[in-house]
């Protein structure tokens, strides 16, 4: 239902079972847009300094211490699938070649990649390879393993880890249409060979013991649940043994190696609570050390530097994240000293630790910041990032002098930045200036929700657009699990803006844009806050001259389907069309079915309708499947996946049947000439959740939106071609 780099917090967020692809400690990781966010510029130079004197932080203070129409009967998935493919094949063929080739003109697609010693390890074609660091951009590389040996459909490397002394390399590999991963271990020699393989691996890390033997720790995933940790050795002393089993089914486990490799952290987590154990990176056979026993509602994550633990936690008031510090040999909570705290409504996006600095990536008032803390003198420098930026893409870096990262937006590809500690300045890449900077605008506006709460929105439109009220509008929403609405670069979003569309991203309660409390105010028995926020956002957009209901469309994936489905029931007059992908729509029946793999882990977000009548009645108030009635609905296009374990197909089909019945009932009394909405269910093969974006899927969804608004889709594809020539 839910939908992460190194980095620290980004890696740990991946452990939430609803996340997709993750490459902790790899560059260019993003789970919602994995194709387009494996992009990097082929050539760039960091020469332009953005400022001379970073200002003291205003955010923080340093403290000492998924076809069928309504006229059709339900068909078999195979026929639906074929129909869905045929709908837009002609349109797709017009732009496929350019879609597939253009990104390589200025960008290259980057899969998992990691630097270790003097080598770079990465995927080239269908192989795991390595090359010398200085030859990384050439064709001079050594093949370590052919992924085709695993006989997977379109396999790719999800994550790479190299043993400390480079005797072994481990890589997690999976198929594009599956969430099941296999971890292979390759012995590095003159003739590299696969030493072992482990199925169903989620996270994994290397450490070295006192005998200089490489030890691989990994978590085993069963039915989407990670409860077991194993450790394995290779060579003459080969073994594989279970190290830890979590017995509480509502928790999951995840491994994270501190940046200095001193400790391997065993993180035991659910949506609201965590517990961390430290495994000595020098003595991995010793018993692990508990940092703090789990306390309901208390979250914490651990990094290490110079015999000190840096703990990001929500303990204490306000119940937002703050940074604490304690000696590594005295990790208990009573020894934690408050080191740094964020201003209210600030989202901690990530944290990176360097030799002399700690870098916090923050979001405040819907804008991005970087705070650099000097660990020697506790100084704080706050950098307000360019207002066009909507998302960070973290880079790993072993250079203690520089902190590199990328910034992006839904309509602007990633751009490199580097903060240089010695100079105390932020530098951006120079060279080709993206024309979108002059042809589009990004606005931050707010909507007042029913209870008076101000809800932030991010809006994009063409600079030279006239009469915005007559322009089509595409609204995006998520609002669950404390996760931010994904705002990474997507070429089709840019095409829409170039073609005159308005894009609006609504950061409603239940998401994480304004911190932990923003999530708390939109979960359990406060889910209706998110619905009220979404309604207020769309009404505010219309009242401020951004489009009108007959030109308004709404899009969401996964858990975002709850709010979209609920709004279609309560305020269908606000919308003309909706696109949903792998949507969660049958909340009540799903949460009452404890045989589903993730129900128990979802209780903290949706409640327990099986044992709590209050939760059951509350869910009934907003659950999309429970509140449909004969009325005029917007047209709906749903993309679903046959073997999706996170959002079962059964619930989506049930929703679609009920929606079709409600539309048919309304049509009986609507009078002659009434045009019912189109209800399309496109069932795709595969078992992944929110599968990799294919060009075919993109064009199908775009064509649906254009057709429903009565717009000529040919213009859109011509606009796409024009953009691709830029």
Swiss-Prot record:
Give the active-site positions: 558, 644, 689
Keywords in alphabetical order, please. Cytoplasm, Cytoskeleton, Golgi apparatus, Hydrolase, Nucleus, Phosphoprotein, Protease, Serine protease
GO biological process assignments: Golgi to plasma membrane protein transport; proteolysis; regulation of synaptic vesicle exocytosis; retrograde transport, endosome to Golgi
EC number(s) on file: 3.4.21.-
Instruction: Give me the Gene Ontology terms describing cellular component.
Output: cytoskeleton; cytosol; Golgi apparatus; nucleus; trans-Golgi network
Tell me which residues bear Phosphoserine: 138
Q: Which InterPro entries match?
A: AB_hydrolase_fold, Pept_S9A_N, Peptidase_S9_cat, Peptidase_S9A, Serine_Peptidase_S9A
Subcellular location(s): the record lists: Cytoplasm, Cytosol; Golgi apparatus, trans-Golgi network; Cytoplasm, Cytoskeleton; Golgi apparatus
The terms under GO molecular function for this entry are: peptidase activity; serine-type endopeptidase activity
Q: Does the keyword S-adenosyl-L-methionine apply?
A: no
Note the SUPFAM superfamilies from the entry: alpha/beta-Hydrolases (SSF53474), Peptidase/esterase 'gauge' domain (SSF50993)
Q: How does it assemble?
A: Homodimer. Interacts with the AP-1 complex.
Function (record text): Serine peptidase whose precise substrate specificity remains unclear. Does not cleave peptides after a arginine or lysine residue. Regulates trans-Golgi network morphology and sorting by regulating the membrane binding of the AP-1 complex. May play a role in the regulation of synaptic vesicle exocytosis.
Family indicated by similarity: Belongs to the peptidase S9A family.
Listed name of the protein: Prolyl endopeptidase-like
User: To which species is this protein native?
Assistant: Rattus norvegicus (Rat)
């Amino acid at each position: 239902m839910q939908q992460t780099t190194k980095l620290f917090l980004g890696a740990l967020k991946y452990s939430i079972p609803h996340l997709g692809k993750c490459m902790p400690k790899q560059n260019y990781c993003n789970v919602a847009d994995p194709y387009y966010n494996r992009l990097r510029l082929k050539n760039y130079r960091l020469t332009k300094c953005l400022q001379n004197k970073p200002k003291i932080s205003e955010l923080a203070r340093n403290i000492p211490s998924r076809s069928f129409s309504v006229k059709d009967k339900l068909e078999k998935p195979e026929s639906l699938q074929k129909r869905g493919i045929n709908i837009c094949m002609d349109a797709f063929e017009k732009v496929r070649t350019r879609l597939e080739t253009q990104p390589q003109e200025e960008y290259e697609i980057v899969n998992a990649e990691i630097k270790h010693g003097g080598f770079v390890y990465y995927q080239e074609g269908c192989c795991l390879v390595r090359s010398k660091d200085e030859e990384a951009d050439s064709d001079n590389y050594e093949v370590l393993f052919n992924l085709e040996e695993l006989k997977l459909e379109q396999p790719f490397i999800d994550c790479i880890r190299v043993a400390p002394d480079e005797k072994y390399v481990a890589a997690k590999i999976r198929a594009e249409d599956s969430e099941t991963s296999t971890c292979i271990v390759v012995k590095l020699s003159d003739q590299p060979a696969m030493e072992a393989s482990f199925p169903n691996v989620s996270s994994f890390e290397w450490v070295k013991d006192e005998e200089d033997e490489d030890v691989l720790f990994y978590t085993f995933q069963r039915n989407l649940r990670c409860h077991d940790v194993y450790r394995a050795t290779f060579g003459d002393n080969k073994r594989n043994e279970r190290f830890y089993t979590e017995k509480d089914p509502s928790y999951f486990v995840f491994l994270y190696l501190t940046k200095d490799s001193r400790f391997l952290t065993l993180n035991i987590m659910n949506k609201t609570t965590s517990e961390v154990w430290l495994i000595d990176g020098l003595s991995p056979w010793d018993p692990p050390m508990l940092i703090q026993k789990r306390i309901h509602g208390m979250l914490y994550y651990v990094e290490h530097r110079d015999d000190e633990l840096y703990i990001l936690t929500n303990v204490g008031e306000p119940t937002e994240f703050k940074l604490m510090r304690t000696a590594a040999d005295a990790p208990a909570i009573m020894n934690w000293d408050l080191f740094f705290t964020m201003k209210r409504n600030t989202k901690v996006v990530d944290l990176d630790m360097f030799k002399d600095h700690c870098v916090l990536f923050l979001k405040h008032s819907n804008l991005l910041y970087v705070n650099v803390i000097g660990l020697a003198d506790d100084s704080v420098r706050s950098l307000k990032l360019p207002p066009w930026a909507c998302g960070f893409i973290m880079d790993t870096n072993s250079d203690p002098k520089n902190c590199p990262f990328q910034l992006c937006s839904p309509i602007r590809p990633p751009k490199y930045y580097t903060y240089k500690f010695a100079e105390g300045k932020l530098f951006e890449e120079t060279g080709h200036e993206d024309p979108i900077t002059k042809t589009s605008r990004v606005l931050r506006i707010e909507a007042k929700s029913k209870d008076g709460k101000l809800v932030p929105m991010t809006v994009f439109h063409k600079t030279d657009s006239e009469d915005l009220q007559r322009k089509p509008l595409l609204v995006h929403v998520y609002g669950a699990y404390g996760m931010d609405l994904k705002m990474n670069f997507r070429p089709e979003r840019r095409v829409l803006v170039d073609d005159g569309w308005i894009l609006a991203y609504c950061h409603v309660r239940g998401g994480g844009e304004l911190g932990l409390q923003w999530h708390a105010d939109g979960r359990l028995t406060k889910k209706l806050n998110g619905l009220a926020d979404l309604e207020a956002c769309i009404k505010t957009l219309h009242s401020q001259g951004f489009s009108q209901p007959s030109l308004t469309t709404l899009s969401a994936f996964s858990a975002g389907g709850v709010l979209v489905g609920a709004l279609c029931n309560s305020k269908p007059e606000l919308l003309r069309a909706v696109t949903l992908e792998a949507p969660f729509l049958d909340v009540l029946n799903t949460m009452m079915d404890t045989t589903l793999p993730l129900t128990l882990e979802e209780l903290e977000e949706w409640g327990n309708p099986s044992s709590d009548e209050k939760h059951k009645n509350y869910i009934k108030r907003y659950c999309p499947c429970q509140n449909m009635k004969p009325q005029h609905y917007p047209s709906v296009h749903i993309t679903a996946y046959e073997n999706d374990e996170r959002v079962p197909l059964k619930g989506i089909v049930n929703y679609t049947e009920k929606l079709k019945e409600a539309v048919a009932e309304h049509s009986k009394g609507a009078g002659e000439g009434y045009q019912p909405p189109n209800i399309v269910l496109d069932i795709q093969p595969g078992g992944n959740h929110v599968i990799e974006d294919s060009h075919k899927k993109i064009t199908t969804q775009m064509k649906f939106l254009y057709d429903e608004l009565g717009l000529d889709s040919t213009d859109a594809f011509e606009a796409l071609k024009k953009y691709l020539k830029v």
